[in-house]
């Protein structure tokens, strides 16, 4: 099995190195091939997603991704910024379904900004559509307004758009995920204001007829954001569009105590996927050896489960992470009283030892 390893920028190389260390500790043989991406890709080829990197990603059975982005690239035109690499990979590999689990581990309940009773036992899965919505809708740009109250003035504009096939395929993915869990699915939209959201809701209701065993409910995105902070354990599986999912999944991540604990998977129709931590490249702490590698290690576990059909090995990694937390090992972002604070490498070593 071939895995494309794309460390990226900032803390990306440090945390990916620990995930690779864990993979190498398993009694499996993987072909791991590394390539530059993001700012590193731009430095190597003049583009954040070099042709050779894209070729490797297409040929691989799965992609293990670190993080991209650095302030020094902010002056580049949008098409050349590091963040375009992840958007390009999603587009070229047709990765349309993003899974973002938000789990509050018992050992970290005191690290959450919410009261322990609100987050103890929290286990949410957010299923986000990745290829449509306002992030990719056309037309978009900056122009002189042709009409309206500010005709003749400069304006920025984007297009929120979804096709029926896009909504149907993410609906099926979400219903199938809910079927394997508590058989509850919440669809989040803004159907009281947006035509696109009403269209989304209508299709969700139609698809639900094929999943009589799954309870479908709906919530407006503003209320969902409030409820995530007020009573998050009411949720199990949430399905939503690209922009709403981007925002809600980041909010949900903070309920757990640290975004440094949360993995993610982006899948195509055949379950080939790109696996990455939910956090960014954190250039402010790059090279200091203090980044939390657990989200990346858990992303590797998701990769084993969803794309490589190695569920037992995924379970082993997840159990090892729980063991390490029970033993009191903590990076700075999840530090708790009485815990043993360690750096990136030591945390990876602890997971390997727990295996």
UniProtKB/Swiss-Prot annotation:
Q: Does the keyword Transit peptide apply?
A: no
Cofactors needed by this protein, per the record, are:
Mg(2+); Mn(2+)
Question: What keywords does the record list, in alphabetical order?
Answer: Amino-acid biosynthesis, Branched-chain amino acid biosynthesis, Cytoplasm, Leucine biosynthesis, Magnesium, Manganese, Metal-binding, NAD, Oxidoreductase
Q: What is its main location?
A: cytoplasm
PANTHER family per the UniProt record, alphabetical: 3-ISOPROPYLMALATE DEHYDROGENASE
Q: What does this protein do?
A: Catalyzes the oxidation of 3-carboxy-2-hydroxy-4-methylpentanoate (3-isopropylmalate) to 3-carboxy-4-methyl-2-oxopentanoate. The product decarboxylates to 4-methyl-2 oxopentanoate.
Protein name per UniProt: 3-isopropylmalate dehydrogenase
Q: What is the protein's species of origin? A: Burkholderia lata (strain ATCC 17760 / DSM 23089 / LMG 22485 / NCIMB 9086 / R18194 / 383)
What would be the name of the gene that encodes this protein? leuB
